[in-house]
Swiss-Prot record:
Cofactor(s) named in the record: Mg(2+); Mn(2+)
Location(s), subcellular: Cytoplasm
Organism: Arabidopsis thaliana (Mouse-ear cress)
Positions of Mg(2+) 3 binding: 507, 511, 515
Domain notes: The Asp-Asp-Xaa-Xaa-Asp/Glu (DDXXD/E) motif is important for the catalytic activity, presumably through binding to Mg(2+).
Transmembrane segments: none
Name of this chain's protein: Dolabella-3,7-dien-18-ol synthase TPS06
Xref: InterPro entries: Isoprenoid_synthase_dom_sf, Terpene_cyclase-like_1_C, Terpene_cyclase_plant_C1, Terpene_synth_N, Terpene_synth_N_sf, Terpene_synthase-like, Terpene_synthase_metal-bd, Terpenoid_cyclase/PrenylTrfase
Metabolic or biological pathway: Secondary metabolite biosynthesis; terpenoid biosynthesis
Gene name, Swiss-Prot/TrEMBL: TPS06
Length: 611
């Protein structure tokens, strides 16, 4: 298959050309001069109520008037249409990156005098700076060989070197190697508690805290480590020493907010570049590579967003159907960036963002606007999956169905030429399952039925849209996601099940208050409180415990799956779990882009890193 290797190995020309043709854009890259700043309109409060003409009969568009509360507008709107990127700068950045890669690559070679322990710590730095993908094959090969002598590597560490032992643990687990947490027993005293001499080792404590989040369901020592390190890191932040080490303090604050293993790789990179630059022993070549790489990615992201915004503007759904859905562009693209941030997945990010936008519109059709008869007719049309199926739908649902149909047909045309029709077959299956999940929830609400928590979770896992979005995630990856990947997904592995449960629970905690306000009582928290006779606060605490348990299950199942599933397939799965933490741990970051999500998006797509 023809592929562009200029900016990455898997950038598919045929897919990008078709994407650009549909948008009436050239398939060649255009990066005019980036504007010095992007202006964003101030957040406008939505009107409290919209009255629109709608239908209670699937074939009658004029039978009733219904009301709905519109979602708040996006903070970014269509502003990325005016953003422009310089092709010359892109090419120059890439040339500099390519020139630095051999220099950094040489640092991964043991023959240069570095021992396995030092190289492992260096890999941790590459990962944290967001540049490890440039050296992935070399890293995987090194760790595979080094794991054969992992005991010797640990023994070679000083008895009190908590920092290095924690880094080694993190790196090997990150790459799918099971390394026992018993290596941390050396840091315990005769009383069974962690030694007091560790209290003053701030770097070691931070690294140990990060390592504790790789724990599985049976590793109690890592649970102890999490409590121990969190306590002492919080004490450090309120002490005098924090004032003297501001860059370490900032990194600790970020870790306590969301640890690296639960954070998005690209967000970790942005934070860590600032930290690494202030380290007195930083490597200038590596720092330069990290900055060049991040700026290059930012420019590509801006170009992707411009392409996505152009598609949305030409689609023009806001003039065709009532705007009962969340009109979002930067947010779904942020999700797609969180799944795969590397440059070779540009076309895949755009397609995934489009899929997220579409799924959200369908979700809101069931949740906010459609009558029970209407959504039933939509489910039946999806089951038929025929362009003639629109005849029985009301006008606004004809638009929704046609948009869904066209997006899938676009992907179908792409994969059929590559003998990859099995990918679309799986995607269709998951779309139908998703529709049935949405319909079940709508019927519960229509009847005023409150299911048991167990019933709700069973259906709610399907209605997270996780399975259909995973299918859409892998389709644009081409041969990198073969038939074996889809057979694995179809087997419903414990890893993906834990992911969907975690996502459901995170979503429920973040959104139940807004759902209750609009009269949607069939949500996870409400089901749990009524069944178990507990308060909302107690239910949220229990959901948080369950979420943490699912994170451990994911860690556990990842280590098992890594033995036979490639890392480039497993990482997007893990990244969906990380998105749940980043976007929903402290509120609904998709509907209401609070300061944190706003800062994330701004740091990636607006404020270019200074070289």
């Amino acid at each position: 298959m023809e592929a562009i290797t200029k900016y990455g190995s898997y950038f598919n020309v045929r897919f990008l050309s078709r994407l650009c043709w549909r948008l009436n854009l050239s398939s060649s890259y255009h990066y005019p001069l980036l504007k010095s700043s992007l202006s964003f309109s101030r957040f406008q409060s939505p009107k409290k109520l919209c009255l629109v003409r709608a239908t209670t009969n699937p074939t009658d568009d004029n039978s009733t008037t219904r009301s709905f509360t519109p979602h708040p507008p996006s903070l970014w709107g269509h502003h990325f249409l005016s953003a422009s990127v310089n092709q010359t700068e892109m090419d120059d950045l890439w040339r500099q990156i390519e020139a630095l890669k051999p220099i950094v690559n040489a640092m991964l070679l043991p023959c240069n005098g570095a021992d396995a322990k030092k190289i492992t710590c260096f890999i941790h730095t590459l990962v944290s700076l967001g540049v490890s993908y440039h050296f992935e094959e070399k890293i995987v090969e090194f760790l595979k060989d080094a794991f054969e002598n992992i005991e010797d590597m640990i023994i070679d560490c000083k008895e009190d070197d908590l920092y290095t032992v924690s880094i080694i643990f993190r790196v090997f687990r990150l790459y799918g190697h099971y390394i026992t947490p018993d290596i941390f027993n050396r840091f315990k005293g005769d009383d069974g508690n962690f030694k007091k001499c560790l209290n003053d080792d701030v770097r070691g404590m931070l690294s140990f805290y990060e390592a504790s989040h790789f724990g599985t369901t049976t590793e109690d020592i890592l649970e102890e480590a999490m409590s121990f390190t969190q306590k002492h890191l919080e004490l450090f932040l309120v002490g005098e020493k924090a004032k003297h080490y501001p860059h370490i303090t900032k990194l600790i604050q970020a870790a306590l907010y969301i640890p690296q293993n639960f954070n998005l790789e690209i967000l970790v990179a942005r934070e860590y570049i600032d930290f690494y630059e202030l380290e007195t022993d930083h490597n200038e070549m590596l720092l330069k590579l990290a900055k060049l790489n991040f700026r290059f990615l930012q420019l590509q992201y801006i170009q992707d967003l411009k392409t996505l915004t152009t598609w949305w503007k030409e689609l023009d759904l806001v003039s065709k159907i009532p705007v009962y859905f969340r009109e979002r562009l930067a947010e779904p693209y942020f999700w797609a960036t969180g799944i795969y941030y590397e440059p070779q997945y540009s076309a895949a990010r755009i397609m995934l963002a489009k899929s997220i936008i579409l799924v959200d519109i369908v979700d809101n059709t069931f949740d906010v606007y459609g009558t029970i008869d209407e959504v039933k007719s939509l489910v039946q049309a999806i089951e038929r999956w025929d362009s003639d199926a629109v005849d029985v739908l009301p006008d606004y649902l004809k638009v929704v169905f046609r948009t869904t149909f066209d997006l899938f047909k676009e992907l179908e045309e792409y994969v059929s030429s590559e003998a990859r029709s099995f990918t679309m077959q799986y995607a269709y299956e998951q779309l139908r399952i998703l529709m049935k999940g949405y319909l079940q929830e709508a019927e519960w609400s229509n009847r005023g039925h409150l299911p048991s928590h167990e019933e709700y979770i069973e259906v709610g896992v399907a209605s997270t849209a996780g399975e259909v979005l995973l299918a859409m995630t892998f389709i644009p990856m081409g041969d990198a996601a073969g038939v074996g990947v889809y057979e694995w997904l179809r087997s419903r592995p414990k890893l993906t099940h834990a992911l969907f449960v975690k996502s459901r629970l995170r979503d429920d905690i973040a959104t139940y208050k807004e759902e209750m306000k609009r009269g949607d009582v069939c949500n996870g928290i409400n089901c749990y409180t009524k069944q178990h006779k507990v308060s909302e606060e107690e239910a949220c605490i229990e959901f948080e415990k369950k979420t943490n348990h699912m994170s451990k299950v994911m860690n556990e199942e990842f280590l098992k799956a890594a033995k036979f599933i490639p890392l480039h397939i497993l990482r997007p799965v893990l990244n969906y779990g990380r998105l749940a933490d980043v976007c929903y741990k402290y509120g609904d970051g998709y509907t209401f882009a609070g300061e944190k999500i706003k800062d994330y998006i701004t740091s990636l797509y607006v404020d270019l890193i200074t070289l």
